[in-house]
Amino acid sequence: MFKDVVEEFKKFAIKGNAIDLAVGVVIGGAFGKIVTSLVQDIIMPAVGLLLGKVNFKTLSLTVTSIDGSEIVLKYGQFIQSVVDFIIISFSIFLFVKLINSFKKKEEEKPKVEEPSKEEKLLAEIRDILKESK
C-alpha cells in the first residue's frame, strides 16, 4: 500500500509539469519579493516626494463612530499594494508575451522529416550505383 503511494508520487513528481510548476512557484515568490521591495523602497518614496513629501505607509483615515470608538483605515498601504499588483501583473504579461513569441518562432520553423526506410534504401542504392560508374 505505502509502496504503491510512493511509486505513484515518484511518477507524478518526475513529470515535467509538476517540476515546472514547483520551479515557477519558487521563482514567482522570489520575484514577488523583488517587486515588493522595488515598490516600497524606490517607486513609492519617489512618488511621495513628487507629491510633496507624502509617506504612503503612514497615509490613513481615522473614523470615529457614534459611541466614540475609532477605526483607522490605512489606505496608503492599500495604494502600495495596488501599485505592487500592477507592476507584477505587467511583468508577468511581458514575460508570457516573450515566451509566446519564442513558441511561435519554434512553430514557424519548417520541420525536417526523417526519410522513410524506402527513401533511405533508395539513397543507398543510388550511392552504390554512382560509385560503380
Curated annotation (Swiss-Prot):
Record keyword Iron present: no
Pfam families xrefs: MscL
Keywords: Cell membrane, Ion channel, Ion transport, Membrane, Transmembrane, Transmembrane helix, Transport
MF terms (GO), sorted A to Z: mechanosensitive monoatomic ion channel activity
Compartments it resides in: Cell membrane
SUPFAM superfamilies linked to this entry: Gated mechanosensitive channel
Gene Ontology CC, one term: plasma membrane
Primary location class: membrane
Listed transmembrane segments: 19-39, 79-99
Membrane topology: Multi-pass membrane protein
Family: Belongs to the MscL family.
Subunit details: Homopentamer.
Cited function: Channel that opens in response to stretch forces in the membrane lipid bilayer. May participate in the regulation of osmotic pressure changes within the cell.
Protein name in the entry: Large-conductance mechanosensitive channel
The organism of origin for this protein: Clostridium tetani (strain Massachusetts / E88)
Gene field: mscL
